[in-house]
UniProtKB/Swiss-Prot annotation:
Annotated PANTHER family: UREASE (PTHR33569:SF1)
Source organism (scientific name): Streptomyces coelicolor (strain ATCC BAA-471 / A3(2) / M145)
Gene3D superfamilies, alphabetized: Urease, beta subunit, Urease, gamma-like subunit
An example molecular function term from Gene Ontology annotations: urease activity
Keyword Cytoplasm recorded: yes
Region (Urease beta): 102-227
Pathway named in the protein's UniProt entry: Nitrogen metabolism; urea degradation; CO(2) and NH(3) from urea (urease route): step 1/1
Name used for this protein in its record: Urease subunit gamma/beta
Catalytic activity: urea + 2 H2O + H(+) = hydrogencarbonate + 2 NH4(+)
Length: 227
């Protein structure tokens, strides 16, 4: 028997759906793959019976209820997409809310719970910064601000060992010619700066590290390094 890939997929889906039907007949509540297969198979069989797309979707939405599935399944299977062959050709059926409610919400296994908002860190230092470049410059929250773009003009000596006082993962954008006052906080942890612009590449508080970093910055043309 020669089958196309689509026909093989259809037989695989039918086998999974038959397993789901057999287990439900034994009184078992269905898991995610079983529920998904049964819903998708219902659409395909409805299409084979000559039903229209809307009718097939409605039939699939009525095949399972909250008591037919394991706890948490309704929270995972929120939509089922299946391509079925109708009388007018192949159509993609999207079955929304296929289990008919019964979700556990925040109590569902694996639910993602939003964390508490973290306040913006309080700045220990405020510096005016001017972007002398012709393009925008963005600096991220944990970048060693001392090593930020050479075309940003600010007192780099005061910014040594500091980062932006903004929430982690955010950034500050400096438009061309724009002057912005930013808040800075000391870099925490072990206070080791590796990479960035390569002006430190070691412990920030090592003897002579600040002076050497300022010398390198001035030699490389960083604005504000000679203040």
């Amino acid at each position: 028997m020669r089958l196309t890939p689509t026909e093989r997929d259809r037989l695989l889906l039918f086998g999974a759906a038959e397993l789901a039907r057999a287990r439900r007949a034994r009184g078992l509540r269905l898991n995610v793959p079983e529920a998904t297969a049964l819903i998708a198979d219902t659409v395909c069989e409805a299409a084979r019976d000559g039903a229209r797309l809307a009718q097939a979707i409605e039939r699939a939405r009525s095949v399972l209820g909250p008591d037919d599935v394991l706890p948490g399944v309704a929270d995972v299977v929120t939509e089922v997409h299946v391509e079925a062959v109708f009388d007018d050709g192949s159509r993609l059926a999207v079955v929304a809310d296929p289990v008919g409610g019964g979700g556990l919400g925040d109590d569902a296994p694996g639910a993602l719970l939003p964390g508490h908002d973290r306040p913006e860190p309080e700045a220990a230092l405020r510096l005016p910064v001017t972007n002398t470049a012709t393009v925008p410059v963005s600096v991220t929250s944990h970048f060693h601000f001392f090593e930020a773009n050479p075309r940003l003009d600010f007192d780099r000596g005061r910014a040594y060992g500091m980062r932006l006082a903004v929430p982690a993962g955010s950034s500050v954008r400096f438009g061309p010619g724009e002057r912005v006052e930013v808040g800075l906080v000391p870099i925490g942890g072990a206070r080791v700066a590796i990479g960035f612009a390569g002006l430190v590449d070691g412990p920030l508080d090592a003897p002579g590290a600040r002076e050497e970093a300022l010398r390198r910055a001035a030699a490389c043309g960083y604005l504000g390094a000679d203040r």
